[in-house]
Amino acid sequence: CENIEGLQLRIGIHLGDVIFENNDVFGDSVNIAARLQALAPISAIWISESVHKNISNKQGIISTFVKEENLKNVKEPVNIYEVDINSFHAETAVPVRTPGSAISPSALDKQKKSFPARKVLSIGLPILAIAMAASFFIPSTLKKQHARNDLLPAIDKLVLENFRVPTKAFDMGVEAEKYIAEDSVLIKLWPIISATPKLRTEPEGAEVFWKDYHTPEAEWRSAGTTPLTDVRFPRGYLRLEFRKKGFQTIEYAGSLAAEPMRLDTALIQLDSTSTLPDDMVRMPKSSTHMYLVGLEQHGPKDVDGFLIDRHEVTNEAFGKFIEAGGYTDRSYWKHPFIQNGKEISFEQAVTLFLDKTGRPGPATWEAGTYPDGHTLHPVTGVSWYEADAYATYAGKQLPTVFHWGAVAATWRTEFIVPFSNFSGKGTIPVGSLPGISTFGLYDLAGNAREWCSNESTNAAHRYILGGGWNDPSYAYNDAYFQPAIDRSLTNGFRCIKVLPGDTTIATLLKPVALAFRNYLIEKPVDDKTFDFFLTQFSYDKTPLNEKTDATLDRENWTIEKISFDAGYNNERIELYLYLPKNKKPPYQPVLFFPGSGDLYSKIYNPDGIEGRIDFLLKSGRAIVRPIYKGTHERHDNIKSDLPEATVFYKDHVIMWRKDIGRTLDYLETRTDMQNDKVGYVGWSWGGFMGGIMPAIEKRIKAIVLNVGGMCMTPALPEVDQINFLPRVTQPVLMLNGKHDMYFPVETSQKPMFNLLGTKKPQKKLIIYESGHLVPRTDFAGETLAWFDKYLGPVK
């Protein structure tokens, strides 16, 4: 028992209470023991002061003070002692070493020599048993403590810091589940960091693989074979593949917590490898919203299922069209040619479709062929007429803007664009960058612009979408048309194939009007006209007849549900007033104007602020959340936040103003509000309305607009945002994304900022490398700093 070679242990011991639950043991005592074990040298036994005191009068055990240590997740410092294993050889009790004391070496040597064998067995064997048990118990305990004390807080931090929870949080959850699967905190986190979609394929039996979209070089992870009903996936943006022997592999990009994959009815059709034309992908039937600036007002549109080219048409493929008589066979050319507003003949047109040396072919070619090494580059330098002729030759057609919109996933531009070709240097081989869109289509963003079949309101102009290698990256979000005869060096295309029985194509092929306003040219109305407009927003200060309908208690704040007369249509306004518990009144009230999602909801969720704007409460401010006309329980026939040149829309703007006015009137009846320090936070739609409401309501003293901007659809002049922006004079902070698909930087964000009437030192625009959402920590930090500066710090 005195010499056991090869046994290397280190032991940490603490005396205290522990909790046993579901065959698991945990608590502060376990944590302290585990931390001591981790700190101890090999072959050492480190104990806490509670153990030291317990053994201080025990015969034959000496413990020596080592140091005071701050252990992780332990509130108070811990005094650490080391057990002197040699002391087990002492015959009688010896003084215990304490900080500042010492033992005579001669006395210790004497006691070692006189220690009987039975004492070795009676003390050494129990210690050895403890040590051997610890060698198995402590690693498991450490991992459980690591899961509880390190992984769970790290997951929670990622959740709090990100509007979209990153895959890293999911991976931490998977690791934690190995050791604390039944932990209540982890169980509550799973719905936040993961999704469990019902994935079905026809036929069944496809193996599903996934990886994070942002790490295309990572190894694929298998989730099992379809149907999948209870398998967790990260909630973030993913790359997926559905693989089944004998069938075409389906690539997919998107979040499995969002449509279409989150729908229980989602069914993925697999096609045998010989069924589909080469390099084409099946797209399912969809109701397509148009997330393209200037075309939003045309959605949603029903689009029947169709096939689409996985890649842009290449130089090699276009060369075969030329070899087949593409520029001489008139059967491929179905549409009248228009140049400078006049129709020209086929013979005249083909004289325009020449390469650099005067031979038939794209404008980028030379001597009848494409540049060396560009075989698999997208064909570019072609007119719409040439693209359409090729599609006819191939037995296909150009996509409509609605087909293109159904596959582009422009609402995730900030993910796709970094993996796409907007290099400014030239085209690259198709599919060589991993910036895929929804169903595994490559290069929809950048490389070549892509002609679409629709004409604008002018038959001579056709849409061309996605942007090209020499365009700014935000061109991916913009709807754009140009003369069909244009042969710019970036013009390319891909094709679709309409399936038998399609009932939507006739509607989708119709001309599409583009909404666009050039705010660099448009001018606001003069002051006299604007003063006349203001009169429509006046209202009588009739009694509020306020009533507190409910009080909801939360851990860190209280929610008061209040109602009062709206002052129009005999309606009542519901107000949710959030009051922080960490500060005493009076509070700085922050008025919140939400995004357009509230127009599609019929029930307000009082806890919906968590993870979005609850940082305002944590800062000690109150959140003022009226239910605006047309939203939630006050739902009506307004269907969109887009401005319209209608009396119906104008009436709603007036009602929204009155909702704000009456809300601020109510706040003035309370003594717990600092009504001279009212802030405004507008989110998306609320960011747009932040360019109108503060011009009318001067009780608002400081403004933060989160992803706001100017719209391309006009309203009647008396409620048109452009006429209000110069009259917004309060301090304004604008937080925007470079890849915003609603409010583009150059045509929407910057014009709004420049038109604001606020003095230059008091307005600020920050543009992030993001889409229609800015990083949460930046949103919170910049907002609080802005309010601290212009409303004053919370006291």
Briefly describe each language-model feature range.
Residues 711-757:
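The feature captures the conserved acid-bearing segment of alpha/beta-hydrolase catalytic domains
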Residues 138-145, 149-304:
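Short loop/turn and low-complexity linker motifs enriched in small/turn-promoting residues
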Residues 642-683:
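Gly/Ser-rich "nucleophile elbow"/oxyanion-hole loop immediately N-terminal to the catalytic nucleophile
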Residues 596-658:
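Cap/lid segment of the alpha/beta-hydrolase catalytic domain
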Residues 283, 328, 335-338, 344-355, ...:
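Functional-site microenvironments in short loops/helix caps that host divalent-cation chemistry
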Residues 586-595:
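Short beta-strand element of the alpha/beta-hydrolase
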Residues 543-583:
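N-terminal cap/lid segment of alpha/beta-hydrolase-fold proteins
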Residues 1-84:
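Catalytic beta-strand-to-alpha-helix segment of the class III nucleotidyl cyclase homology domain
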